[in-house]
């Protein structure tokens, strides 16, 4: 084992850590909205605050990170499996963000210690993964999944440097980058997904594994994803070699994939090709990670074709492949047409994480509130539906219709780690700024404490329709309030006076010299409605040679309905329907709901931390009329009833369903 670095002191103040590092000077395209330092978002309360605290205090603090850092430091890995070797990168980034945001010195001390253990194990040549030294050589410098695993190590080190200014993190990530620059590039190793080379690889269907680019069925994209953290390193250092390498990677995707997948993104943007047609298998999470790199290169170079490619892909996914909850991915990939099955391996947590990050990047680049709307829907519905409300562990898949608690307890694997990472990232999505402009994108009960401007945001939104923003530190600011597109009649007041110009799907700009005690209030009326599922079919499945699950369509006369309240998606969850006397009821077969009248609000008292309000609706279960309780989908992480013995963790004790038949 290499020595552990002794200097474990970072020059930060947990009370308020400034944005020490800025990448803006390296970019030709400035962000319309710049994220605020995570430490400036404080005292997050309500349902979201409770779940973020659960992630920090229960999951991250109790995670056996020592075991996984030992695995990296010992460096004896030779197998294909990637789940052990991706834990340290994701945990380091999550724990740093969570500790800095919350002012948690205990967690900060723990993550610093583990970070310096990892850095202390770094080889002289720069390698920082888990693969055994005697496995690697100049002709085989990494394992097949190293690029994917180290993607998160790159980003963890870069995030630590950006948020804290820790020079050791920067030095380490530069050494890691140097390892890839030495071994990959023109006339060196490349990210081929199989033994085939261009042009013999053109339009070939692949299966199996590759030497350096992950699963062959990803057609090189599981190696090329390093274009993003490498370009980020250019932004942090200004060293052109990192930009050149990132551009070299992207310029070869067509050749390596054998499907011209990068160039044909232009056809996706034109609307003449679905993203699923780019190659035989389009893995959602892997594509998102590459898209983040394309957007970063757009910022750096000003190449508008990159923005067009990614925004066009986002529009296609949003219009065809996004679920009502804001989640994406069908058995980890994108399907043809409007194929979106309701149960099974649906909405992978890894894809949730990278889709949220991708959407946030598009918001920052464009200032278009449609992206913030999509993030709101995803955050308040699917992000927390995937999280076990007791341990904080996250599911691999969280289908709209399914069963529990089976699915919450597995791993650690890619999705448990992606779950804690996206929850740790959430506070970075609430607010943004640029010059005198300040953007409030997500109405989560919290405090913002900046150097010249501060406020408290309260109101328990979205359980409540009302938001209150009280200024606590005054400055001249243009406050940009996102008015959601789903809200038809938003009302905004400053110190009790109604403002004109409040229009849904836009920012309302309020330009004034604020005084401490000034108060902004928003009233965002939420429509309650049943919605019929569009483009619904039956979806028989089949598999590719590598075992990947794919789907076909069959017509059906049975079309389900869901209940919405503003951005909140509801479900029938048998945890809250004990009176039906069948906790694992087959809801699709035996339950029919009355969609001709709206559900009524239900009074509910419980000691658990859940989002409300609850509703009651009429239904028929196996021939008898019943009252069903409808609850926000985000609550399905509670898989037990208060006061009752908990079921076996791997059981299917309770069923739930967003989509119900009438």
What is each model feature region?
Residues 1-26:
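Bacterial Sec-dependent N-terminal signal peptides
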Residues 91, 105-141, 171, 321-330:
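Helix-terminus loop motifs that line ligand-binding clefts
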Residues 119-123, 165, 181-186, 238, ...:
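Helix-capping and short linker residues that terminate individual alpha-solenoid repeat units
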Residues 182-258, 262-263, 273:
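Solenoidal tandem-repeat scaffolds enriched in leucines and small polar residues
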Residues 477-480, 492, 510-525:
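C-terminal beta-strand-rich structural cap/linker in extracellular carbohydrate-active enzymes
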Residues 487-512, 530-538:
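Solvent-exposed beta-strand/loop surfaces of large extracellular or lumenal domains
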């Amino acid at each position: 084992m290499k020595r552990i670095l002794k200097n474990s002191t970072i020059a930060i103040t947990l009370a308020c850590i400034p944005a020490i590092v800025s990448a803006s000077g390296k970019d030709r395209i400035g962000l319309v909205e710049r994220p605020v330092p995570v430490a400036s978002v404080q005292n997050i309360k309500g349902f979201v605050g409770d779940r973020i605290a659960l992630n920090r205090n229960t999951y991250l603090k109790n995670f056996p990170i020592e075991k996984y850092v030992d695995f990296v430091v010992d460096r004896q890995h030779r197998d294909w499996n990637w789940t052990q070797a991706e834990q340290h990168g994701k945990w380091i980034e999550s724990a740093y963000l969570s500790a800095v945001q919350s002012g948690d010195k205990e967690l900060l001390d723990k993550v610093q210690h583990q970070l310096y253990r990892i850095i202390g194990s770094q080889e002289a040549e720069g390698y920082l993964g888990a693969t055994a030294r005697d496995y690697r050589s100049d002709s085989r410098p990494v394992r097949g999944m190293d690029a994917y695993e180290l993607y998160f190590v790159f980003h963890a080190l870069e995030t630590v440097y950006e948020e804290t200014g820790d020079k050791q993190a920067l030095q380490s990530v530069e050494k890691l980058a140097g390892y890839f620059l030495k071994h990959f590039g023109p006339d060196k190793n490349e990210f081929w997904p199989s033994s085939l080379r261009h042009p013999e690889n053109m339009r070939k269907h692949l299966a199996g594994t590759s030497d350096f680019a992950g699963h062959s069925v990803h057609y090189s994209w599981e190696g090329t994803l390093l274009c993003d953290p490498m370009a980020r390193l250019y932004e942090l250092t200004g060293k052109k070699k990192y930009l050149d390498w990132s551009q070299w990677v992207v310029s070869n995707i067509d050749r390596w994939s054998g499907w011209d997948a990068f160039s044909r993104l232009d056809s996706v943007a034109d609307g003449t090709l679905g993203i699923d047609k780019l190659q035989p298998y389009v893995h959602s999470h892997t594509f998102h990670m590459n898209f983040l790199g394309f957007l970063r290169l757009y910022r750096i170079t000003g190449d508008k074709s990159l923005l067009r490619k990614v925004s066009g892909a986002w529009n296609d996914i949003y219009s065809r492949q996004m679920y009502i909850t804001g989640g994406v991915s069908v058995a980890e990939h994108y399907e043809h047409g409007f194929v979106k099955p309701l149960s099974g391996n649906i909405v992978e947590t890894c894809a949730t994480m990278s889709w949220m990050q991708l959407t946030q990047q598009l918001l920052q680049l464009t200032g278009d509130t449609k992206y913030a709307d999509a993030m709101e829907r995803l955050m308040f519905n699917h992000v927390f539906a995937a999280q076990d409300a007791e341990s904080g562990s996250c599911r691999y898949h969280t289908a709209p219709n399914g069963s529990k608690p089976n699915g919450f307890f597995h791993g650690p694997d890619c999705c448990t780690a992606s779950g804690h990472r996206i929850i740790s990232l959430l506070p970075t999505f609430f607010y943004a700024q640029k010059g005198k402009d300040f953007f409030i994108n997500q109405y989560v009960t919290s405090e913002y404490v900046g150097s010249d401007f501060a406020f408290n945001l309260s109101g328990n939104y979205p359980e409540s329709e009302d938001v209150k923003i009280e200024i606590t530190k005054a400055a001249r600011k243009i406050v940009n309030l996102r008015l959601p597109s789903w809200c038809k009649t938003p009302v905004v007041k400053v110190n009790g006076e109604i403002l004109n110009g409040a229009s849904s799907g836009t920012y309302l700009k309020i330009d004034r010299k604020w005084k401490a005690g000034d108060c902004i209030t928003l009233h965002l009326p939420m429509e309650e409605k049943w919605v019929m599922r569009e483009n619904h079919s039956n979806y028989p499945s089949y598999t590719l040679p590598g075992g990947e699950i794919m789907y076909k369509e069959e017509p059906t006369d049975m079309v389900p309905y869901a209940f919405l309240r503003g951005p909140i998606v509801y479900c029938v969850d048998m945890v809250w329907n004990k009176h039906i006397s069948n906790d694992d009821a087959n809801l699709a077969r035996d339950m029919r709901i009355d969609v001709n009248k709206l559900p009524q609000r239900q009074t509910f008292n419980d000691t658990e931390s859940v989002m409300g309000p609850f509703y009651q609706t009429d239904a028929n279960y196996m021939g008898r009329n019943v009252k069903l309780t409808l609850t926000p989908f985000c609550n399905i992480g509670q898989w037990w009833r208060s006061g009752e013995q908990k079921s076996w963790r791997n059981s299917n004790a309770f069923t739930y369903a967003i989509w119900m038949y009438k």
